[in-house]
């Protein structure tokens, strides 16, 4: 008779699976709570202590760490000396292991969890059994996911055992399972110690979706989510309408969310190819939409739109007039949703914006042969901390407008320049190898909208005085920039020449 060892924390669909094993000639070894569930279901089981000849000790910390278990798992059936050892020691082979692990992830996700509770939910015996069974997959079937119950049972019913190919695949899955489990433990304990640069970095990600393709149609792509997901994320958004998000949709939506979380007043962000083409704010959402649209009515076509207020019908009627890829907001009024959903290709998503200021973990960027890890740029700034370096002092209204432009330029690709008034961006110049070209693009986009309220933000310092000179020649009245160039004085002199108020922040916001 074949033997299966069953010990799970997630008991969903367990009883039908084990009944199927029994019906196909397996006897069942089980432990603790799993044994109680199976006994109550009328399934005859063997207690683990009857196999190990040793009681559970230390409040269940030691149950299965025993040669009678691991010998039965690791013995190679095709080696006579292994089988002779089992016979000599009266160890019975174990042919199938069904194990999932203590709920460590669920424990550390609880608000205010104590480290002692987390420690008690670190499984030791479970991963050991999983690894032993997976190592010996030529002879042992390891099941760590209830999604595999039906396939395993079907093969056993058909052939009396699982195929070698299935066992190999399940073994690989089992090692991924334990690796991810250990990775979460490593991340948690590393965070508890405050270490920021561990010599070994382990990250755990769960496959969320296999994409149709990547950035281009010839590239394969997959979407993975952090095993401890962040609430304010496009991956946590609820899609109400439209086709699945593409690879590029997800990148643009992510960038739109990064940008809009900067703003508290009613704001609309239009994102295109991961660059803001229009940001508008107002006393109402429809006013913010009008201003974001006016910022660049050409580029917004086919854009990704993020709004930080529930979408009403008036705003929806205006959005409905143009083609948009995605609209993501805290919610939609019923009539607004009904109108927008008339276009089958638009994707409508909702997300809990109350979570936008939750601490964000690091961000990862891949490079060939490695990766870069950095904190996300979520620095909160106050314009009262800025330093005016010119003869002309900015007014309070100009400072507020400069802060709006400063938040916007933070999310444009470097070298980045944003021209704005107190209502919206007027022109965005981004991604140029030199800063003066970015400024010229921004001025071109702004056109005749430049007036006495127009200010300029630069994501990094001016290496020469040419940018400030060009700004002065085109009517810019105030500038915010980090400062710190060896030629800062050239820019200051140009600002004084054109009567520009210029402040420095001491903070750079490169984005690549």
From Swiss-Prot:
One of its GO terms (cellular component) is cytosol. PROSITE patterns: MGS. Pathway: Purine metabolism; IMP biosynthesis via de novo pathway; 5-formamido-1-(5-phospho-D-ribosyl)imidazole-4-carboxamide from 5-amino-1-(5-phospho-D-ribosyl)imidazole-4-carboxamide (10-formyl THF route): step 1/1; Purine metabolism; IMP biosynthesis via de novo pathway; IMP from 5-formamido-1-(5-phospho-D-ribosyl)imidazole-4-carboxamide: step 1/1. The keyword Hydrolase applies. It comes from the Bacteria. SMART domains: AICARFT_IMPCHas (SM00798), MGS (SM00851). The IMP cyclohydrolase activity resides in the N-terminal region. Belongs to the PurH family. This is Bifunctional purine biosynthesis protein PurH. It comes from Limosilactobacillus reuteri (strain DSM 20016) (Lactobacillus reuteri). The gene is purH.
């Amino acid at each position: 008779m074949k033997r299966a060892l069953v010990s799970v924390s997630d008991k969903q669909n367990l009883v039908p699976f084990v009944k199927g094993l029994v019906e196909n000639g397996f006897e069942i070894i089980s432990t603790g709570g799993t044994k109680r569930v199976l006994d109550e279901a009328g399934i005859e089981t063997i207690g683990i202590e009857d196999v190990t000849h040793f009681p559970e000790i230390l409040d269940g910390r030691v149950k299965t760490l025993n040669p009678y278990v691991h010998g039965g798992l690791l013995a190679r059936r095709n080696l006579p000396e292994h089988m002779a050892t089992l016979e000599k020691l009266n160890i019975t082979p174990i042919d199938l292991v069904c194990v999932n692990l203590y709920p460590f992830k669920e424990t550390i996700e609880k608000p205010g969890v104590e480290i002692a509770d987390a420690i008690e939910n670190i499984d030791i015996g479970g991963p050991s059994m999983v690894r032993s069974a997976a190592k010996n997959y030529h002879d042992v079937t390891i099941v760590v996911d209830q999604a595999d119950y039906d396939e395993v049972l079907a093969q056993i019913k058909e052939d009396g055992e699982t195929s070698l190919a299935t066992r190999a695949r399940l073994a690989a899955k089992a090692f991924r399972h334990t690796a991810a489990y250990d990775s979460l433990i490593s991340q948690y304990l590393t965070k508890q110690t405050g270490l920021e640069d561990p010599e070994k970095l382990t990250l755990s990600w769960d496959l969320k979706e296999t994409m149709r393709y990547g950035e281009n149609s010839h590239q394969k792509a997959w979407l993975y989510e952090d095993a401890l997901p962040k609430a304010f994320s496009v991956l946590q958004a609820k899609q109400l309408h439209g086709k699945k998000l593409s690879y590029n949709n997800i990148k643009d939506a992510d960038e739109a969310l990064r940008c809009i979380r900067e703003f508290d007043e009613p704001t609309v962000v239009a994102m295109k190819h991961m660059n803001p083409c229009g940001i508008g704010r107002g006393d109402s959402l429809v006013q913010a939409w009008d201003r974001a649209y006016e910022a660049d009515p050409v580029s917004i076509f086919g854009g990704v739109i993020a709004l930080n207020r529930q979408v009403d019908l008036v705003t929806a009627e205006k959005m409905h007039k143009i083609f948009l890829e995605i609209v993501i907001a805290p919610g939609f009024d019923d009539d607004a949703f009904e109108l927008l959903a008339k276009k089958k290709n638009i994707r409508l998503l909702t997300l809990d914006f109350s979570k936008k200021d939750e601490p964000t973990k690091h961000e990862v960027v891949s490079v060939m042969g490695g990766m870069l890890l950095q904190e996300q740029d979520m620095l909160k700034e106050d314009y009262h901390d800025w330093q005016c370096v010119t003869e002309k002092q900015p007014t309070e209204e100009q400072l507020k407008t400069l802060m709006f432009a400063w938040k916007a330029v933070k999310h444009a690709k470097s070298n980045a320049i944003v021209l704005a008034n107190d209502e919206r961006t007027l022109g965005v110049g981004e991604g140029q190898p030199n800063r003066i070209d970015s400024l010229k693009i921004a001025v071109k986009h702004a056109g005749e909208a430049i007036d006495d309220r127009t200010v300029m933000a630069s994501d990094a310092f001016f290496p020469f005085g040419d940018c400030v000179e060009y700004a002065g020649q085109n009517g810019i009245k105030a500038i915010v920039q980090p400062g710190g160039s060896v030629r800062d004085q050239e820019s200051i002199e140009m600002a004084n020449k054109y009567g520009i108020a210029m402040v420095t922040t001491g903070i750079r916001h490169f984005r690549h």
